[in-house]
Amino acid sequence: FFDFGSPASYLAYTQMDGVAKRTGAEIVWRPMLLGGVFKATGNASPAMVPAKGKWMNADLARFARRYGVDFNRNPFFPVNTLVMMRGAAAFEGTPQFRPYVDAMFRAMWVDGKNMNDLPTAAGVLKAAGFDPADFMAKAESQGAKDRLKATTEEAVARGVFGAPTTFVGDHMFFGQDRLDFVE
C-alpha cells in the first residue's frame, strides 16, 4: 500500500523490483489515500511532529544513499495527493500503471515539483506520455474514486496506519526500512 505523498513509499518503490527478482515474489501495488488512513486510525504525518520530521528527513536521505537512488525533499510538501492517487487507481492493472507511478514518484521526490499546481502537473503528465485531459477524465471517474476508497478502507481493515505498508501473506511490514524483513 502506498501514497505518492509519502517519501518512504518512493524509497520502497525504488527497491521492490529488486526484492521481487531476488525472491520470485509478485508485487501487487495498492494505491491508497494516506490522509484517509490517517483520519481513520488517528495517526498523523511525521512532518506534523517537528522533532520526528527533522529526524525523518535525515533518515530518508541516509536510505536514499544506501539504495543509490536520487531523492530530494519536495519544497511543496505536504501535497494533497487525492487526484494523483485516483489516477493510480484508474491505471491499476493496466500497462500505464507503472509509467504513471514512475512519473509521479519522480515528480514528487526527485524533481520536487508542485503537483498541486495544475499547469505543473499537466507538464509532468505530458512529459511522461499522458494526455492531461484524458488523465483527469480517468482520475475523476466514479470507478477510480470507488476503487481508491475501497483500497483505502481495505488497508485500514488490515491494520495499515501509514505508508508504505507491505504484506507478505497476512504478515504486515510498515516502512521502507523493513524491506529486509519483507525479503
Predicted feature descriptions by range:
Residues 4, 8-111:
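Structural alpha/beta surface segment adjacent to cysteine/selenocysteine redox centers
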Residues 5-25, 99, 103-183:
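C-terminal cap of thioredoxin/glutaredoxin-like
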